Each structure stands twice: as C-alpha cells, then as structure tokens.
Amino acid sequence: MQVATTKQALIDALLHHKSVGLVPTMGALHSGHASLVKAARAENDTVVASIFVNPLQFEALGDCDDYRNYPRQLDADLALLEEAGVDIVFAPDVEEMYPGGLPLVWARTGSIGTKLEGASRPGHFDGVATVVAKLFNLVRPDRAYFGQKDAQQVAVIRRLVADLDIPVEIRPVPIIRGADGLAESSRNQRLSADQRAQALVLPQVLSGLQRRKAAGEALDIQGARDTLASADGVRLDHLEIVDPATLEPLEIDGLLTQPALVVGAIFVGPVRLIDNIEL
C-alpha cells in the first residue's frame, strides 16, 4: 500500500492505473469504512482512500471544539485500510489541501445543503462539496463510495456531479450497525458506555417507524419526535420523513404510499449523532 501526503505524490501513484474507486474519509475509521473499501475493491482495479479532516465543513471553518476534538489516529487508520485492501492512501495536511489559506472559490450547495443537517450546521455541505470536488479532480475516480448513514451528503454529492458534469459514479453503501443497533460512526468513540446506551433510542425510533410502514399502519412522526425529545440524556435536533432524492419533507396524511427516508439527528452529551432508515 502506498501512502501519499502531497498532491503530486498522489498523481504520480495513479499513473497507468486502470479503473479507480475512491473512498473519501476523515479518518477515525471503523467497520463502516471497511465496508466502503470492500465495495470499491469489488468493482475497481485500484482503490484509493483519502484521510483528511476538512476544516471547511466544521463550524467557524475549523475554529471550534468539534474540529479540534475530532478523533485522529493515522497509524490505526492505515492499518485498517491496508488490511481492507486499499492500494493508495492520500493523507494530506491542511496546508497541502488549501495552500495559502482558505479557498476563494467554493462549491455552493444551495437549498439541498441548507435543510436538515445544513440548517443545524450552516456551511457544512459547502465545505463537504468543495473538498470532494477537489478530491475528484485529483484522483479522477471512475466510482466514489459514500456511506448511506450520511444520506444528505450522498444527495449533495449526487447533485454536485450532476450539476458540474463530473464523470464519476456515486455508489452509496448500506449503513453498518453495531450489535446493539447503533450506526457506526467515528463520533461513537466520544460516547461513554452510558451515553451509548442512551443513543440507542434513535435507531429504535427509526426501526419502529419502518415496522409501522411495513405493517400498513399510519406513521406518527410527531410521536416519534416526542419519544426522542423526552429520552434521558438526549436532545433532539431533527426528525423528518423526506423524499430520498431531494430530501424535501413529505407531508404524511395517514398512510405513506411512496418511497421515503426518515432522517434524524440527536445530541447525547456534546456528541451529535445522525441516522436514517428507508421506509
């Protein structure tokens, strides 16, 4: 496995490669990331993974505790990626990605990036889209792999490549969950055992809505919100039933008769967790 820390080293490493699959990450890797690599490995001659904690997608452009406290464990991440079968790792520092300071030209995500997660984290998806566009330009992948846990990110990236005519196929990969049902996330490392137990109310509420839909029962989204809002140690950010492509909230009057996604975010202590499930 090659490790490139500069753009030029990455470009050199990619010379003469055939089909390329890209797995963009911010490090602090877990089994969910390994599943992305597995999917990329099955469809491409060469698999590239990036590790970069992107300040542009954090509050105050990284001048915040969430960015400073984000887990960084490069040696462990490299070991996981090598075992998973990655060929090339791109692990630049901030100066390499943004030489001379923050970029003047950004990818602006408009309405799809300002609702749900974007409403709670203004500018987040502009930062995501900007760094992903840079990675696409550097790697020139045939396919790129993203976890379905970040459903809005997948929708934003799909729109990015469609609107800017970037020739890459976007491949969402299903959510990986722990034995207790909690969606795998790098932020889970910051939960105590008690906080992890409290966080389980989110996947439980989501799966409850899914069961009601499968049984042909009416969905009580407000009741689901109330359950989350009243749970011990939990603060509700949002819970919505949305169109899977546009993420526009769906007005549910009785039974749900169209494909939909229920997306939610909660705080457990200082840790913000997201999850979603198909209905």
Curated annotation (Swiss-Prot):
Q: Name one GO biological process term.
A: pantothenate biosynthetic process
A GO MF annotation of the entry reads: pantoate-beta-alanine ligase activity
This protein's record includes keyword Cytoplasm: yes
Q: Which residues bind (R)-pantoate?
A: Q57, Q153
Its main localization is cytoplasm
Q: Which Pfam families match?
A: Pantoate_ligase
Q: Looking at the record's lineage, which domain of life comes first?
A: Bacteria
Q: Which residues of this UniProt protein bind ATP?
A: 26-33, 147-150, 176, 184-187
Which compartments does it reside in?
A: Cytoplasm
What are its E.C. numbers? 6.3.2.1
Under the heading SUPFAM superfamilies, the entry gives: Nucleotidylyl transferase
Subunit note: Homodimer.
* PANTHER family cross-referenced by the UniProt entry: CYTIDYLATE KINASE/PANTOATE-BETA-ALANINE LIGASE, PANTOATE--BETA-ALANINE LIGASE
What does the protein in this record do?
Answer: Catalyzes the condensation of pantoate with beta-alanine in an ATP-dependent reaction via a pantoyl-adenylate intermediate.
According to UniProt, the name of this protein is Pantothenate synthetase
Gene assigned in the entry: panC
